Amino acid sequence: MDGNRGIPAHSRSLFDPPEQESDRREQGSGPVKTLFAHIDGGARGNPGPAGYGVHLVDDKGNLVAEISRYLGHRTNNFAEYSALIAALEYAMQHGWNGLRVISDSELLVKQIRGEYKVKSPDLKELYDRAMILIRKLAPFSIQHVLREKNRDADRLANWAMDNPALCGAGYIHDRK
């Protein structure tokens, strides 16, 4: 463990085998409930006023929830990682055991897949946190899409940046 941050000192790729088999959902432990998360983060000025949006749908395309959060003065990459963590936490807290993430951040997608190294200390801490959560979900996937294919999440991220007083602690519109 890194004594300064309380996070693992080494990084693991999504494609590395889990440290313990119990980290992943056990085979035959019930039906897979997969949530689809369109995520986006942004910062005006980069760094600057930042926020993220998460648009969550079920496997039939029905809206499950939308999340927006204002993050204060941050970078766009910090906001992208924060959106991913919000999607992971929502899935786990609401009984979904699988997650498919769609993002327009090539950097985030390639870092989570292990194709790029995480060099920024701020992002490394978020990356490690995301990887701990990812190992608890099966199936998990992440894919890159063009910005035009991620409009709902972009709208929510911009709404967070436009409404910091409403989204400072996070805003969740849950369809349950």
Positions of predicted regions on the chain:
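Compositionally biased, low-complexity linear motifs
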Residues: 56, 125, 169-174
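Short C-terminal domain-edge/linker segments immediately following a structured domain
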Residues: 66-71, 86-87, 130-134, 171-176
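Residues at secondary-structure transition points
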Residues: 73-78, 82, 118-121
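RNase H-like nuclease fold core
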Residues: 12, 28-78, 89-97
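RNase H-like, Mg2+-dependent phosphodiesterase core
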Residues: 16, 63, 67-69, 113, ...
